[in-house]
Amino acid sequence: MTVKTRFAPSPTGFLHVGGARTALYSWLYARANQGEFVLRIEDTDLERSTPEACAAILEGMEWLNLNWDEGPYYQTKRFDRYNEIIVQMLEQGTAYKCYCSRERIDTMREEQAAKGEQQKYDGCCRDKAPRDTDEPFVVRFKNPTEGSVVFDDHVRGHIEFANSTLDDLIIARTEGTPTYNFCVVVDDWDMGITCVVRGEDHINNTPRQINILKALGAPVPEYAHVSMILGDDGAKLSKRHGAVGVMQYRDDGYLPEALLNYLVRLGWSHGDQEVFSIDEMKQFFSLDDINKAASAFNTDKLIWLNQHYIKELDPEYVASHLEWHMADQNIDTSNGPKLSEVVSALSERAKTLKELAASSRYFFEDFAEFDETAAKKHLRGVALEPLTLFQSKLAGLNEWTLEAIHQAIEDTAAELEVGMGKVGMPLRVAVTGAGMSPAVDLTIFLVGKVRAEQRISKAIEFVANRINS
């Protein structure tokens, strides 16, 4: 049997980290078992579902590279199929029309609450013949009243619900639209889903859905209900903890590999290993290894992973993600070094791509003035001679190579009988406008000969004016 999983978000908001982790687990289980992964949009909540939210979900999935084999399917395009099954169930007696008014239902629940009883439908219309009337009605599933629903969850183990505790679920509303729990069942059946991976908040839906599947004569899939994600203070994850949409992490400068690596470890482990490539995730992932305890979101750990991937991934690939941030910060990269070279130069210190982009601006644009602190320390009178001598050596270079630039710096220091720092630091401030950069020879090489000469001239003028003032 081919393993087939699905991710079925509701387009009522962005794809948040909890949903992304569920999608990742479902995707990994399919990929680890040479199976198929289905994307389904559960948009039956017509009031809250929006095209913008749907687009955000698809964009998030694509950015994470969680590719799907089928879909996206939309529940709103399958209403005819749901209604077909509802008619079939009414004819077979596994569903019935309920004419109880909202007032009667509310009164019934109030009385049950006053008696300390479980609040559920009392079956008033369960065994009555359908009325030949225009009265409004809902359609309810005729849930078994005896026995139990039993299933073995990949994460939570053996779970059992007594049928006597389950309601006769509404499967079609008064206006005829099918309900969430019913649509899910028909979709999972029609799409051949063999394993449902979802959040623990769906556990109470599972026995109801299993009973509907059995009433339809449909196979029952396996289930894996994963725990919620908490903030580092133990409270349910919210925006103040960083529970933002997946694309916000892109905007903040995270690589998809870092977020995926972080999310897979939020509840799953393989020994003591912390860093996993996508191929390693597929190789080692198992639903049975997911921890049933809730996991705490730790932004520092995510930042650490992001730093790792910025340094370790192919600079060309990292540069492809950096392009968005350069454009977002209005940095024109058409006149400057290759972005992959910038990534190689700056990756050691960058925590995020957003930070990397901001720190690379001097490679592509001239700066208005020198950093005050750096200039005060390094563009003093003693810097005039090394800057002037190096500029003359720079002008005489026959080839623009890293080695030639490095040799020019060494020769300048040797001729002046000073340490490399006495030459390198003034040059760094001159060429970048600041006191921090990659190795000064590499920085000058990437800035380019014309820009480097212009900026050193500017620094010489700055120092001369300082001497004369």
From Swiss-Prot:
What's in the keyword line of the UniProt record?
Answer: Aminoacyl-tRNA synthetase, ATP-binding, Cytoplasm, Ligase, Metal-binding, Nucleotide-binding, Protein biosynthesis, Zinc
Q: Which reaction does it catalyse?
A: tRNA(Glu) + L-glutamate + ATP = L-glutamyl-tRNA(Glu) + AMP + diphosphate
| Species the sequence originates in | Shewanella woodyi (strain ATCC 51908 / MS32)
Residue span of motif 'HIGH' region: 9-19
- GO biological processes: glutamyl-tRNA aminoacylation
Q: What is its EC number?
A: 6.1.1.17
Q: What is its main location?
A: cytoplasm
Where it sits in the cell: the answer is: Cytoplasm
> Short name of one Pfam family for this protein?
Anticodon_2
This protein's GO cellular component annotations are:
cytosol
Question: What PROSITE patterns does this protein map onto?
Answer: AA_TRNA_LIGASE_I
Which residues of the sequence carry a binding annotation for ATP? 239
Identify this protein by name. Glutamate--tRNA ligase
- HAMAP family recorded: Glu_tRNA_synth_type1 (MF_00022)
Record GO terms (molecular function): ATP binding; glutamate-tRNA ligase activity; tRNA binding; zinc ion binding
Quaternary form?
Monomer.
Q: Which cofactor does it need?
A: Zn(2+)
